[in-house]
């Protein structure tokens, strides 16, 4: 691919529309574009809420050195979108330089996005960078899930990849609200011991930004779930005050360490259900 054209590109705009007979409304794609090594499957609706679920696929099977991927998700007023993947995202050896994914998300008034991909697996000598920006409204709701797994290596060691960098910037009405950063550099420092992985192998992070998580009952239910889960997890209140924005959303973050993808995925699913049912 040339410098001007990414390895894979995907753009979706989701709007709320009534059916042809004027019945119940659903969220549908009014604009869709893909090119290169990214595709989406036909959407489906898991329940009667009208939220559309799109599954992103990478026909190439993995991210390689120097690959660049660009995703743009635009969810209009009152629309709801869930984005997942067909399988784990795998980052192979990257001698040509890091694989890099950028994602820009725009959420309208009362719009909702659940971004819940399968796990990210970074293999030996792999390097991966991810930059996400979110522009949302006070009434929008955002859920973002990530599970990071070290890939297999011939030596049997767990952390043989070169680097992992993930940055998420969230703005409300263009005002900076929160920045989340994760940086793991096994090639430069030990990450297995006390103060980092604590002997665990898998990392999870789950970000909620919504007025719903401001409800004490929701926060208490999340705290109890985290406390009793079979992961080593914590619940954090994040985001800076936005005094000029009436009824601003609240940000809660669940961070986890575990010995398996399944343990974190189970926690994320249960936590997401608590917020969705609020």
Positions of predicted regions on the chain:
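N-terminal, charged/glycine-rich beta-strand/loop interface patches
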Residues: 1-119, 124, 131
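A short, polar/proline- and glycine-enriched secondary-structure boundary/capping micro-motif
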Residues: 39-42, 92-98, 125-127, 153-157, ...
């Amino acid at each position: 691919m040339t410098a001007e054209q990414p390895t894979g590109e995907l753009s979706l705009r989701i709007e709320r529309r009534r059916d042809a007979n004027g019945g119940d409304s659903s969220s549908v794609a009014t604009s869709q574009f893909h090119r290169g090594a990214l595709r989406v499957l036909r959407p489906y609706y898991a329940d009667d809420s009208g939220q559309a679920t799109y599954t992103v696929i990478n026909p190439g099977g993995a991210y390689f050195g120097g690959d660049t991927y660009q995703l743009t998700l635009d969810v209009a007023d009152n629309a709801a979108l869930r984005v997942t993947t067909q399988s784990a995202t795998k980052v192979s050896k990257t001698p040509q330089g890091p694989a890099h994914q950028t994602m820009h998300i725009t959420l309208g008034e009362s719009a909702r996005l659940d971004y819940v991909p399968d796990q990210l697996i970074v293999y030996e000598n792999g390097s991966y960078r991810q930059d996400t920006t979110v522009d949302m409204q006070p009434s929008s709701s955002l859920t973002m899930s990530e599970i990071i797994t070290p890939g297999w290596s011939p030596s049997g060691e767990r952390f043989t990849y070169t680097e992992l960098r993930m940055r998420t910037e969230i703005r409300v009405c263009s005002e900076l609200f929160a920045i989340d950063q994760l940086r793991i550099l096994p090639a430069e420092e030990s990450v297995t011991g006390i103060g980092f992985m604590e002997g665990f192998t898998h990392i999870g992070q789950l970000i909620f930004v919504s007025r719903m998580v401001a409800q004490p009952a929701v926060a208490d239910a999340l705290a109890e779930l985290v406390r009793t889960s079979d992961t080593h997890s914590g619940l954090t209140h994040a985001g800076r005050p936005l005094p000029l924005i009436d009824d601003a959303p609240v940000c809660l973050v669940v961070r986890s360490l575990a010995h398996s993808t399944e343990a974190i995925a189970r926690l994320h699913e249960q936590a997401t259900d608590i917020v969705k049912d609020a």
